[in-house]
Amino acid sequence: MSPQTETKASVGFKAGVKDYKLTYYTPDYETKDTDILAAFRVTPQPGVPPEEAG
């Protein structure tokens, strides 16, 4: 039988929903040589703000 491991609830992701605007932009991010630039055109569904759809 393998040894048991202990899982702590405080490690990892916390439950709940964060405001998307708080998580999608990092103003002090510095690009790296390994970063990949990708562009997508997104059309929001009716009632969804454009910044939330992208």
Swiss-Prot record:
Keywords annotated in UniProt: Acetylation, Calvin cycle, Carbon dioxide fixation, Chloroplast, Lyase, Methylation, Monooxygenase, Oxidoreductase, Photorespiration, Photosynthesis, Plastid
Subcellular localization(s) per the UniProt record: Plastid, Chloroplast
UniProt key word Oxidoreductase: yes
Enzyme Commission no: 4.1.1.39
Name recorded for this polypeptide: Ribulose bisphosphate carboxylase large chain
Record text on subunit structure and interactions: Heterohexadecamer of 8 large chains and 8 small chains.
Pfam families (UniProt xref): RuBisCO_large_N (PF02788)
SUPFAM superfamilies: RuBisCO, large subunit, small (N-terminal) domain
Species per Swiss-Prot/TrEMBL record: Icacina mannii
Recorded catalytic activity of this chain's protein: 2 (2R)-3-phosphoglycerate + 2 H(+) = D-ribulose 1,5-bisphosphate + CO2 + H2O; D-ribulose 1,5-bisphosphate + O2 = 2-phosphoglycolate + (2R)-3-phosphoglycerate + 2 H(+)
Residues recorded with modification N6,N6,N6-trimethyllysine: K14
Maturation propeptide residues: 1-2
Gene Ontology biological process: photorespiration; reductive pentose-phosphate cycle
Role this protein plays: RuBisCO catalyzes two reactions: the carboxylation of D-ribulose 1,5-bisphosphate, the primary event in carbon dioxide fixation, as well as the oxidative fragmentation of the pentose substrate in the photorespiration process. Both reactions occur simultaneously and in competition at the same active site.
